Amino acid sequence: MMRRLMTIVIMLLMLSSCYYFNQVVDDIRDSNAMERGRKKDGGGAYENDKYKEGVYKAIDDIVKRPVNKKIQFEGTELIIPENTVINPDSWTLLDLKTGYGLPISFSTQGLCLNKTVKGKVYSLWYNKVMSGVNEIGKKIEKVNGFTYTCK
């Protein structure tokens, strides 16, 4: 009887704090975000074995393209490589020829590469380890006037 009573008390304490429930919900949300990123049009597509080879071929192709396409992003004009767009769901660069997402993303939250337009901060992030992505990112950074603000 005492064991059951203690079990009930412990369960009530766990349920009343909601910590474990919130932890499970957060884990599910994080897992879903990671899975969305690894889809073909997500910024993490290169991590998916199914798309890895195609993503690297797309990167090699995009490196050769000029960075001259003007697009609107959250109230400002950005210049990105030809035949690419910013994926409206993940804000990552998307190749229109192949449909592959690249590990280059844009944000309205301050990161290290920032550009301020009319008091609003825009950020650029790209995978600096991947050689082709690093080249594309540096071109976008230079053309759009992003500045490195981290120390």
What are these model-derived regions, one by one?
Residues 94-128:
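A short acidic-to-branched-hydrophobic micro-motif
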Residues 1-20:
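Sec-dependent bacterial lipoprotein signal peptides
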Residues 19-100, 125-151:
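N-terminal targeting sequences that direct proteins away from the cytosol to non-cytosolic compartments
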